[in-house]
């Protein structure tokens, strides 16, 4: 199956609550590669690459996030594969 990448912008109370760590763990569990990083405006940017089905599973998970977070919105953008990510990094 073709590998795709998606970029997600997660808004809400998502910084300082372990969101990136849990996202990285979930991404690896789903067999995805990519990263999660904090943005200056308080959002978290997630780029994930893998099969469309696994990306959809991550998208659904991001809408809830870990129990410590309060997700208000998840915006999903398609992303050109700019980098062949190894693992799922926390930036």
UniProtKB/Swiss-Prot annotation:
Transcription as UniProt keyword: no
Enzyme class: hydrolase
Keywords: Hydrolase
UniProt EC number: 3.6.1.7
Alphabetized Gene3D superfamilies for the sequence: 3.30.70.100
Superkingdom of source: Bacteria
GO molecular function per UniProt: acylphosphatase activity
Acylphosphatase-like domain boundaries: 5-91
Active site (record annotation): 20, 38
Reactions mediated catalytically: an acyl phosphate + H2O = a carboxylate + phosphate + H(+)
Similarity comment: family membership: Belongs to the acylphosphatase family.
NCBIfam families hit by this protein: PRK14426.1
Name of this chain's protein: Acylphosphatase
Species annotation: Vibrio cholerae serotype O1 (strain ATCC 39315 / El Tor Inaba N16961)
Lineage of producing organism: Bacteria, Pseudomonadati, Pseudomonadota, Gammaproteobacteria, Vibrionales
